Amino acid sequence: MAVSCTPTLGLSSAPDEIQHPHIKFSEWKFKLFRVRSFEKTTEENQKEKNSSEGKPSLEQSPAVLDKASGQKPEVAPPAFKVHPKFSKKFHDDGKARDKAIHQANLRHLCRICGNSLKTDEHNRRYPVHGPVDSKTQGLLRKKEKKATSWPDLIAKVFRIDVKTDVDSIHPTEFCHNCWRIMHRKFSGAPCEVYFPRNATMEWHPHAPSCDICYTARRGLKRRNHQPNVQLSKKLKTVLDQARQARQRKRRVQARITSKEVMKMIANCSKIHLSTKLLAVDFPAHFVKSISCQICEHILADPVETSCKHVFCRICILRCLKVMGSYCPSCQYPCFPTDLESPVKSFLCILNSLIVKCSAPECNEEVSLEKYNHHVSSHKESRDTFVHINKGGRPRQHLLSLTRRAQKHRLRELKLQVKAFADKEEGGDVKSVCLTLFLLALRARNEHRQADELEAIMQGRGSGLQPAVCLAIRVNTFLSCSQYHKMYRTVKAITGRQIFQPLHALRNAEKVLLPGYHPFEWQPPLKNVSSSTDVGIIDGLSGLSSSVDDYPVDTIAKRFRYDSALVSALMDMEEDILEGMRSQDLEDYLNGPFTVVVKESCDGMGDVTEKHGSGPAVPEKAVRFSFTVMKITIAHGSQNVKVFEEAKPNSELCCKPLCLMLADESDHETLTAILSPLIAEREAMKSSELMLEMGGILRTFKFIFRGTGYDEKLVREVEGLEASGSVYICTLCDATRLEASQNLVFHSITRSHAENLERYEVWRSNPYHESVEELRDRVKGVSAKPFIETVPSIDALHCDIGNAAEFYKIFQLEIGEVYKNPSASKEERKRWQATLDKHLRKKMNLKPIMRMNGNFARKLMTIETVEAVCELIPSKERHEALRELMELYLKMKPVWRSSCPAKECPESLCQYSFNSQRFAELLSTKFKYRYEGKITNYFHKTLAHVPEIIERDGSIGAWASEGNESGNKLFRRFRKMNARQSKCYEMEDVLKHHWLYTSKYLQKFMNAHNAVKNSGFTMNSQVSLEDPLGIEDSLESQYSMEF
């Protein structure tokens, strides 16, 4: 390149005589290599070009001109621009250097709070993506928290997700102050820690105005003088290029060396398949995605790191052990505990790849999933001819032989294994053989089958236990056919037997259903079979039929009462033994235990189903059930309580005993079905049950309390007249007139024995009295009582009956009946329509045909009274209605609570006063309604509640609410178990309902839900029966607010 020279002033101000010629040459040299400005205009370039025409070129001119010529050589700066390629390279190198500095600064900052890690004098820092330290691990184990790494704890305590962090943006360590905050969260110990920020620390990529780098640069250091860029830029560029080339070469060599080292560490060329065996020529990117990034073979048993790189399990574990806990691809922190299985879609694609068989004589192409099996067939075929064969046809493979031939061929090996097992393993041949099989699978890299076999050896199994599957089926309301469809679908999709087949569930059912456990009665029960393996029986069994008997058109299924009680006790075995331990009683105590049983019975209305064959039965149902309320043991001179039902009104503890499609008003049918059951119950009262529980024969006595009946059914089974009778009460002999005149002061006088005596008087009429006189003598007993009930109040139906009466009072107050008692029927209907419309608008209460528990609960509130008062013009009536409702709401908890002495002691103490004031209001302000009459449940509420509480301790615990909830389950089970025969359908319903109430299955279901919801999830929901999980334990501590 020719560069023109123009005579200009020298660089030095000294005279020419004293300047050395080499100095001038050096100045000329620097001017020669100086790079001109990139912004120089075209006019300046043109001027320089014109001025250089006709001048000698650089090659033609000497280094120093003759002094005689009188000219001082001076080289004009060259007019050329830097190539864009070099400009971009300089820019990229600068950016890379800035990023490296930024990343170095990040290493000294805390990931959570952003403070500098240098401020800690002990230099305590913790890896964000590492396993928790031993102290924290011990604390988590003590608190029963399942955690092994910091990311989960950081996400829980600080609400920061660090699993997606990038090293170039986020710091990789956190400070001791944040560690102490997490430690305090889990330990609950007060300590002086604080969080220095008011918001979450946000991290951004490096930018020209980066706060992190600017903070690191500023300070009191003296700034270095910048070299003269104009003079040294070209020389510096050449040196930088040479250095970068050397670094690039070094990096490539290091990468190649690192790859070779990792391949040497993995050493898997003999067990993993090369990508050259792929049958299809896939794109390079796809091949890279399905190959291990360490050994570059096709992925075998792939695992995924937290940074989303995929490796063979053996390769990554070996590399982590030798090279440290970093990802081989991106150097991101990685630990063996972070390895997870890739997503199923990726595994499906990987397993479906077609590969060529590596055997030289085989040209088959098989899927990767079946490759091991295919190759093993080659080995087996080769091994077929290895054995000594003294002529004849070739030896057949072992698996193709009959069982007898297999025994003959393996006889010598079997003897050797037996000798080894006897010598080393105590004769456990099975464990030795399973372990050999397990090692063979591991050696052939078939880890999935090996894991399943190992789980079976440990008793866990690869899937769920049959009891867990049964609990899932029962609690999700799946019939057998629906469960079987789900089982087949899951097995076909996953290839694993996660759920157990139906026959395994039926084996688990047998243990839980009545008729499995042996027992004995001392003395034996009268008129009851001594056999114990009795399951579901027909409701009419044991009924002696004759031509004159009442023809029973019904379908009934039941358990035998004693067998059902034994099954219920064995289902509660763990609870009973745990209760004994909690009372510091020895496990070997054999009793006698006293079991208190609540009995419930209720009729159901329309249960019509449009299917099933069988007799024409009424589409109404009756259910008889029982609940084990309390179990005590005689210890010394006192009875110690070892079990008490925590939720006595739950449908989960109300066990069905008898189901029948019959009308509860049909006295003959009801008597025919329930009489054998009542006979068993009467026989059990005078005998003791001998049952083996916990390996010890124990003695049980039973106390039966029939309290879960509504008033209609009590009158039916106790032989009393219907609820419209003049004898208003099932607890005392008061008539309706007597009860209205004396609202409060009555005592309980009726009993089952007295009713039986009165029935005999009614039947025989020994005094030869008239009907009216006889009726007055027996106080309303008109039929033979056949079920013994406890004189009590059913809390649920008491609420419903009282709410219906208040609903009527609201209508009468709207119509101002206290002024005009003689209102027509049309006017009364208009008042009801007005009330319904207003309640729907104000209280969102939709009108119903018949009062139910939910409507009663919503209706009986102060808000409802306020809404009704808007329709009543008189202020005085407002006050009377409000006071009546307030008194009722003060009295209601006494008969609704399970233990009023603990739950509402004040209301219990004030009950007598409140009931007298309530009665006074009825007889004065509401005299138009209650003069000479009163409703059945108002009478029981005002007169008998304190006496029942004093006798039983509670009314609410003995209510029929659990049985009412069971009625809803009956409808659901019946729809679910629809079969062609109604007879079998009732068996399915009874069996499914019994399993639904099993405490054993409920524990399995709770444990299954706890495992499913465990882990550090942001919105985990723990079942109510579970102990406090980590979510609750964290939230109950101090709330972490930034």
Curated annotation (Swiss-Prot):
Residues engaged in binding Zn(2+) 4: 357, 362, 374, 378
Compartments, as annotated in UniProt: Nucleus
Cofactor note: Binds 1 divalent metal cation per subunit. Mg(2+) or Mn(2+).
Segments forming RING-type zinc fingers: 292-331
Residues engaged in binding a divalent metal cation: 602, 710, 964
DNA-binding region boundaries: 391-458
Highest taxon in the source lineage: Eukaryota
Zinc finger boundaries on the chain: RAG1-type: 353-382
A Gene Ontology biological process term: V(D)J recombination
Glycyl lysine isopeptide (Lys-Gly) (interchain with G-Cter in ubiquitin) crosslink, residue number(s): 233
Disordered, as annotated region: 40-80
PROSITE patterns: NBD (PS51487), ZF_RAG1 (PS51765), ZF_RING_1 (PS00518), ZF_RING_2 (PS50089)
Binding site for Zn(2+) 2: 292, 295, 312, 315
Family, per entry: Belongs to the RAG1 family.
Name listed for the protein in its UniProt record: V(D)J recombination-activating protein 1
Organism: Oryctolagus cuniculus (Rabbit)
